[in-house]
């Protein structure tokens, strides 16, 4: 409420919310709903995660699309559909399988993280990237890396081997990412 900004939230997430949001700031969000904020259009869609009515988002401006895909248990059809349309994406690479298995985390937490409704591993995120990245993708920001169960250099190296022309960036948990110029590439067959 400090900035009096509207909060776009699903009913399920609102019901499970642990803090108070002023009623006049609440904007209920529904699956596959498009919301306009200035010149941006935001599309939301349901995803697999162990939360109440979780959604991911694609932010568009003109023909350029940026996906925000974090807190994902598995790459469902909805996620794949939207990922294939993105010029850039923030993609969860939460954990490395070996680091998680050797970590001090209790068994139940390891199962929650890796059990298909928790978080996306480096391997699963890489599979999504290799098999479904569009030819026009320019940037991939590896996001939501666990400080205990992943390593930024490891994740970057893994993706860089398969990146081609895509710039791979590890999003820091401590500082903002740089500003990138991302644009819709026009094919040589386009009349424009």
Report the location of each language-model feature.
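Short active-site oxyanion
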Residues: 2-7, 65-66, 167
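Active-site HxH/HxHxD metal-binding segment of metal-dependent hydrolases
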Residues: 1-33
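Short, charged/polar "capping" segments at the starts of alpha-helices
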Residues: 13-19, 149-150, 176-179
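Core dinuclear metal-dependent hydrolase active-site scaffold
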Residues: 30-88, 179-191
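Cap/insert and terminal regions of metallo-dependent hydrolase folds
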Residues: 77-172
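Binuclear metal-dependent phosphoesterase catalytic core
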Residues: 158, 165-192
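Short, surface-exposed connector motifs at secondary-structure boundaries
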Residues: 1-3, 62-63, 135-141
């Amino acid at each position: 409420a400090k900035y009096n900004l509207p909060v776009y939230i699903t009913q399920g997430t609102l019901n499970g919310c642990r803090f108070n949001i002023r009623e006049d700031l609440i904007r209920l969000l529904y699956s596959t709903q498009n919301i306009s904020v200035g010149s941006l259009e935001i599309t939301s869609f349901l995803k697999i995660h162990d939360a109440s009515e979780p959604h991911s988002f694609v932010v568009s401006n003109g023909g350029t699309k940026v996906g925000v895909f974090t807190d994902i248990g598995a790459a469902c059809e909805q996620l794949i559909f939207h990922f294939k349309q993105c010029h850039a994406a923030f993609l969860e690479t939460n954990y490395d399988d070996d680091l998680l298995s050797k970590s001090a985390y209790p068994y139940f937490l390891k199962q929650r993280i890796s059990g298909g409704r928790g978080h996306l591993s480096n391997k699963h995120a890489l599979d999504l990237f290799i098999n479904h990245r569009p030819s026009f993708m320019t940037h991939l920001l590896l996001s939501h890396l666990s400080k205990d169960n992943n390593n930024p250099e490891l994740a970057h190296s893994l993706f860089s081997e398969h990146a081609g022309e895509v710039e791979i960036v590890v999003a820091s948990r401590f500082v903002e990412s740089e500003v990138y110029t991302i644009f819709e590439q026009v094919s040589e067959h386009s009349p424009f």
